[in-house]
C-alpha cells in the first residue's frame, strides 16, 4: 500500500460517503492550518 492511499484511508469506517468527504476535508484543512502557523512563526521569529 502506498503512502498516498494510506492518507486517504481513515482509521475508522465512515458511516456514509458524506462522513468520508467531511473527514478528508478536515484533514486537508488541518494540514493547511499547521502550515500557516509554521510560516507565521518563522516570520515572527526572523
UniProtKB/Swiss-Prot annotation:
Its main location: membrane. Keywords: Membrane, Sarcoplasmic reticulum, Transmembrane, Transmembrane helix. It is a single-pass membrane protein. It is found in: Sarcoplasmic reticulum membrane. Residues 43-46 are lumenal. The chain crosses the membrane at residues 22-42. GO terms for biological process: negative regulation of calcium ion import into sarcoplasmic reticulum. It comes from the Eukaryota. Inhibits the activity of ATP2A1/SERCA1 ATPase in sarcoplasmic reticulum by decreasing the apparent affinity of the ATPase for Ca(2+), thereby acting as a key regulator of skeletal muscle activity. Its high expression in adult skeletal muscle, suggests that it constitutes the predominant regulator of ATP2A1/SERCA1 in adult skeletal muscle. Also inhibits the activity of ATP2A2/SERCA2 and ATP2A3/SERCA3. Homooligomer. Monomer. Interacts with ATP2A1/SERCA1. Interacts as a monomer with ATP2A2/SERCA2; the interaction inhibits ATP2A2 activity. This is Myoregulin. It comes from Homo sapiens (Human). The gene is MRLN.
Amino acid at each position: 500500500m502506498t503512502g498516498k492511499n494510506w492518507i486517504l484511508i481513515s482509521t475508522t469506517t465512515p458511516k456514509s460517503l458524506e462522513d468520508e468527504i467531511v473527514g478528508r476535508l478536515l484533514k486537508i484543512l488541518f494540514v493547511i492550518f499547521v502550515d500557516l502557523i509554521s510560516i507565521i512563526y518563522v516570520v515572527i521569529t526572523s
